[in-house]
């Protein structure tokens, strides 16, 4: 649901209610037709997808807070589903995720949900898990152990967004998380090709990382 943020940005720039209408219609349809069950846990409700939605939903809803289309009825539906996501991620079994980028994406989403809902148990649990995961997954030289530039930068995105959110909420940032972000950002400095893209190693796309470097410089200055 990354495109929900794009809809929000379009709404913020234009004020055109068609973007709010699309957001409400698509999200309502998704919530009503994609329930959490044993089958959906294999596809649309894998923990990694639920974690990614935690970020995208809580970010995108803010763009539409002044739209009349985001009414009490919709917010009740939205909040109930967000609570379901939070409980699902909070109770997720801790297996391979501890040493996988999946775990970071899951608990990064749990952090966003915890802050959005004011659920301290979610927020604190997410931070403890994230701190453990970056210590296990990030080598001393700053490289993510799965040896994929794309996975490296997905994890770095989550770590930077964690720092950003904690700064915005005036909360203490765990030192291990900040240290991991600095090391990972410096890896991007070394990795970046002349065209600004990351190398195509492992399961990687040819993605420009200059925006990631800019965010790193701002947050870690």
Predicted regions and their residues:
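Carbohydrate-active enzyme catalytic cores, enriched for enzymes
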Residues: 150-221
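Active-site lining segments of carbohydrate-active enzymes
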Residues: 35-150, 154, 160-164
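Alpha-solenoid helical repeat scaffolds
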Residues: 6, 13, 33, 63-70, ...
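Non-membrane alpha-helical segments in proteins
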Residues: 1-13, 25-33, 48-63
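A short structural micro-motif
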Residues: 29-30, 132-133, 187
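Short amphipathic alpha-helical/adjacent loop interface patches that line ligand
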Residues: 27, 86, 185
């Amino acid at each position: 649901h990354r495109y929900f943020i794009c809809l929000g940005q379009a709404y913020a720039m234009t004020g055109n209610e068609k973007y709010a209408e699309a957001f409400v219609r698509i999200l309502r349809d998704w919530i009503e037709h994609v329930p959490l069950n044993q089958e959906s846990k294999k596809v649309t409700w894998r923990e990694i997808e639920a974690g990614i939605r935690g970020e995208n939903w809580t970010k995108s809803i803010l763009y539409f807070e002044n739209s009349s289309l985001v009414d009490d009825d919709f917010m009740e539906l939205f909040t109930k589903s967000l609570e379901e996501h939070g409980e699902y991620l909070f109770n997720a079994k801790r297996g391979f995720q501890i040493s996988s980028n999946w775990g970071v994406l899951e608990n990064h989403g749990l952090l966003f949900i915890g802050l959005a809902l004011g659920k301290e148990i979610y927020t604190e649990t997410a931070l403890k898990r994230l701190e453990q995961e970056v210590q296990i997954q990030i080598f001393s030289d700053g490289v993510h152990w799965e040896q994929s530039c794309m996975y490296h930068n997905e994890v770095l995105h989550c770590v930077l967004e964690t720092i950003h959110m904690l700064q915005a909420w005036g909360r203490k940032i765990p030192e291990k998380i900040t240290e991991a972000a600095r090391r990972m950002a410096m890896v991007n400095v070394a990795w970046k090709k002349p065209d600004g893209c990351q190398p195509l190693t492992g399961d990687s796309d040819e993605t420009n990382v200059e925006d990631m470097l800019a965010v790193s410089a701002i947050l870690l200055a």
